[in-house]
């Protein structure tokens, strides 16, 4: 959902 996920 964010930078890596």
From Swiss-Prot:
GO terms for biological process: neuropeptide signaling pathway. Keywords: Amidation, Neuropeptide. The modification Phenylalanine amide is found at residue 5. Belongs to the FARP (FMRFamide related peptide) family. This is FMRFamide-like neuropeptide RYIRF-amide. It comes from Arthurdendyus triangulatus (New Zealand flatworm). The lineage of its organism: Eukaryota, Metazoa, Spiralia, Lophotrochozoa, Platyhelminthes.
